[in-house]
Design a protein with these regions (language model features):
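Flexible "cap/lid" loop of the alpha/beta hydrolase fold
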Residues: 164-215
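Catalytic active-site module of serine/aspartate enzymes centered on a nucleophile-bearing elbow/loop
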Residues: 301, 305-379
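The conserved beta1-alpha1 loop
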Residues: 76-80, 148, 288
Length: 379
């Protein structure tokens, strides 16, 4: 029998905890991943990378719904590091039902988008990519920009590069589980000592791993317990279905190691504080999970300190990928953000003069479902 390593034992323990914790979750809580957009297109960036873009038109029954300040904005959802547009699937559906046109896309080197030259894997380039996507999919009219993790960095970088577009067209911004930089993000919640090792060795280690794709793919197939342990630790802070853990693991481990390695140094050294200033006067939601190990609350607090009038929402029992862990709650916060922004425009409210607000919210419905399911499983 092969001896069990300490990490293997820990992985097994985490997986068993996941199994027990998810016993109370109904199968209906497993997201329906298949989604048919109204339109799928390819947008080519300035340097020739093909980005996979999907557009959802509002449901016909919602098109006549009245929106404050006139025309309903297009909502653009931007995913994070080592994920794909799929992580926004539940918000896409909900926003469409509420009468919004939605644009999502896979960032360069992720999902169904093309692989770029590795030297272009920078946050500044992602900001330029977002500008290109906007120019093709919604060249006029109001927009709401929502970014998760590296997607939030993309939005901030775009704002710094295109302040005039922000001033003229951006109705609202959602920055979810993200960071302005300056926090040694590649510590990944490991602590200062271990984190410094990861921060210094991570990109090189990933690059070396990418040269041995065959063995790594074998590990991917055989190491499900380890994958589950990694995802459970860094993605979530409350019980989720095993299927959700599997799907997030698939997104992460399907991302090219070369691409991961190329982005990490730029993420670790970036400073987006000057870019954030361009969002002054824009209704902004800054949201993070209380148990986020990748971008803890201190990252969000730094953004809020720079941005007058921002609303800071902390979600209890939530990890880094909060929009999949607590989808209904995140959707509700996005709808509230858009409503606040539309009301501010209609009433002539100066957003920058509003007081900063910090709220802590909890997904009560999920807790109730978990308790109810646990009782049913025990009976």
């Amino acid at each position: 029998m092969t001896p069990l390593t300490p990490f293997g034992a820990a992985a097994g323990a985490v997986t068993e905890r996941l199994r027990r914790a998810s016993t109370g979750l109904r199968t209906s809580e497993e997201p329906r991943w298949a989604h048919v957009p109204s339109e799928s297109i390819t947008v080519t960036t300035e340097d020739g990378v093909a980005l996979h873009v999907e557009i959802d038109a509002p449901e016909s029954a919602s098109r006549g719904r009245r929106h404050l300040a006139g025309r309903a904005p297009t909502v653009v959802l931007v995913h994070g590091f080592a994920l794909t547009m799929e992580c926004w699937v539940l918000q896409r559906r909900a926003l469409v039902r509420h009468g919004f046109r939605v644009v999502t896309y896979d960032q360069r080197g992720h999902g169904r988008s093309g692989l770029p030259d590795l030297e272009t894997c920078t946050i500044a380039q992602l900001g330029r990519d977002l500008d290109t996507v906007l120019g093709v999919t919604c060249p006029s009219g109001p927009v709401v920009l929502v970014g998760h993790s590296m997607g939030g960095m993309t939005v901030m970088s775009f704002a710094g590069q295109h302040p005039e577009t922000v001033r003229d067209r951006v109705l609202a911004v959602g920055l979810v589980s993200t960071s302005p930089g300056g926090h040694d993000i590649t510590e990944l919640g490991l602590g200062s000592v271990a984190g410094r090792v990861v921060g210094s060795l991570g990109p090189g280690v990933l690059t070396r791993l990418s040269r041995h794709a065959g063995p790594i793919n074998v590990i991917r197939r055989m190491g499900k317990n380890i994958q589950d342990a990694v995802v459970a630790r860094w993605a979530f802070d409350s019980p989720v279905s095993p299927g959700l853990v599997d799907r997030v693991a698939e997104m992460i481990f399907a991302t090219s190691f070369d691409v991961m390695a190329a982005f990490l140094p730029d993420i670790d050294s970036m400073d987006l504080a000057p870019d954030i200033v361009a969002l002054t006067g824009v209704e902004t939601l800054v949201l993070n999970g209380s148990g986020d190990l990748v971008t803890p609350a201190s990252h969000s607090e730094q953004i809020v300190r720079i941005l007058p009038g921002a609303e800071h929402v902390v979600v209890e029992d939530a990890g880094h990928i909060v929009m999949l862990e607590h989808p209904e709650l995140v959707t509700e916060q996005l709808l509230m953000l858009i409503a606040r922004a539309q009301r501010a425009v209609a009433e002539g409210v100066a957003v920058a003069s509003k007081p900063r607000v910090r709220r802590t919210v909890q997904d009560i419905s999920k807790k109730r479902r978990g308790r109810r399911g646990g009782r049913e499983a025990a009976s």
